[in-house]
Amino acid sequence: MNYYMEIKTEIINNEITKKIKDYSKNKSDLTTYYNVGKLLSEAGKHYGEGIIKEYSNKLSKDLNKKYSVTTLSYMKQFYESGIFQPLVGKLSWSHYLQLLPLKDKDKINYYIDITLKNNLSKRQLCERIKSKEYERLDDKTKKKLIEHK
């Protein structure tokens, strides 16, 4: 019996399982945030924007967990932005929060693509956005990126 190989295999299998669980949890969280955002958006149309504050208080009380107005507003904005797609589920919530202020879909798609291709951290993505990397691309390059989609 080769104990080393069994130990190594056990550790590798555990790492694979953790990665799968992390991805699944992230995707589940994002789907939940999207669905909550959709409901908040619809509720806002019926009851006004003050409903977010009311729901924040109720959720915090009922679930014994703080659901701030800001967090719920981000969820609503996340839904309304339309940037959540199954493939993009590979990004974390903190990545999405960096993308929410952007309004141009081509710009958003550019930053999503570079984040996925380069495995950028939230901080690295933020730096690229702040440096206006997309805006510094020439029009010809931007056109190619759009056509490539």
Locations of regions flagged by a protein language model:
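Basic, low-complexity intrinsically disordered segments
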Residues: 1-149
